[in-house]
Amino acid sequence: MAAEGKAIAKVNDLVIFVPYVVPGDVVDLQIKRKKNKYAEAEAVKFHELSPVRAVPFCQHYGVCGGCKWQVLPYSEQIRYKQKQVEDNLRRIGKIELPEISPILGSAKTEFYRNKLEFTFSNKRWLTNDEVRQDVKYDQMNAVGFHIPGAFDKVLAIEKCWLQDDISNRIRNAVRDYAYEHDYSFINLRTQEGMLRNLIIRTSSTGELMVIVICKITEDHEMELFKQLLQFIADSFPEITSLLYIINNKCNDTINDLDVHVFKGKDHMFEEMEGLRFKVGPKSFYQTNSEQAYNLYKIAREFAGLTGKELVYDLYTGTGTIANFVSRQARQVIGIEYVPEAIEDAKVNAEINEIKNALFYAGDMKDMLTQEFINQHGRPDVIITDPPRAGMHQDVVDVILFAEPKRIVYVSCNPATQARDLQLLDGKYKVKAVQPVDMFPHTHHVENVVLLELR
């Protein structure tokens, strides 16, 4: 399997990437795109099914674009993810490595996400089976997921296996009410229509947040919209936060928009080891709560804290890792690009009465400088959890200048992690590697690496 989750076929030295098939399948392929060194294709006929193939459990498999590895048993999924980490670190990093620990699989392989966002559209995607029936469909409104490569088309989702079933019941109830009362769904090209997005967040504390996003251009639409909100509140009394956002822009970003409370609170909480983390409608929080806890425990274990260390937490986000390790450190300093995330980090520190954590907002390469190190002290430990692109060269240079005893590198992209490890290799030796599966049925894998000063 390739890193993008596609299977690989070879014809006369031409490498062909094929989605929705598994090693051992015998298929006819149709080339969809050809480059100099590789091609992309799709399977048009199956002659023989692989003995390792699993039966997809989701009725939307192969259309919605998510959970592409349902056709692999979970044991095979994590085997390929383990191999992906090993291949990236060895082929890209080209550094000396210890034995890589077996990947930590997810206890939950279904209903493991705590957040899903659904899109409304008046252009429902018709599946191949529906098109072949040559029937005119009266109801072309849909709420579900975007179709890959067709931004204005949405696949109507009946059941998604990623979030607790309350999510399915809420989405389907909203859809049916909107159908019955003739609410307009947004046209993603012309931006006409009322209903835009539906976000559902659950938490380990049992709280439930629902955010409905709409476009309101006339007074009577607001009254209609509030009737929908009241229907949701009456139908699902377990909702602890029913919120709405009016978005009259031409895009779906909500960071610059006000959030209004229709019922309940404007936030909910996640809990780990007695710590409470406030999660608002715009807050980032790892979407697999149980596996995030395991990931953070690994990072803390690798950090080897005794209570005397100054810890820098780079790309701290909402400060979850920083606050999580603070009780084992002398002081923690978190740095993050997004100001709103830093405000969340400070709030979470205050909620948990954490006095030894400081947080700073700014671009990492501009914030983490030699002057910053000289002012705040040389860290004993650096924990870094960068975005998929990895760390900027300037950030790597300052880490090398700071010379912490240990670096804990948490990555959602082992390829860029491997590149960065190579840049650190002159001064640091990799001591431990622990892959973690946060997203079953996808090709994505997290990896935690411990480096120690040579």
UniProtKB/Swiss-Prot annotation:
Pfam families: TRAM, tRNA_U5-meth_tr. Residues 1-45 form the TRAM domain. S-adenosyl-L-methionine binds at residues 286, 315, 336, 385. GO terms for molecular function: 4 iron, 4 sulfur cluster binding; metal ion binding; rRNA (uridine-C5-)-methyltransferase activity. [4Fe-4S] cluster binds at residues 58, 64, 67, 160. NCBIfam families: rumA. This is Uncharacterized RNA methyltransferase BT_0643.
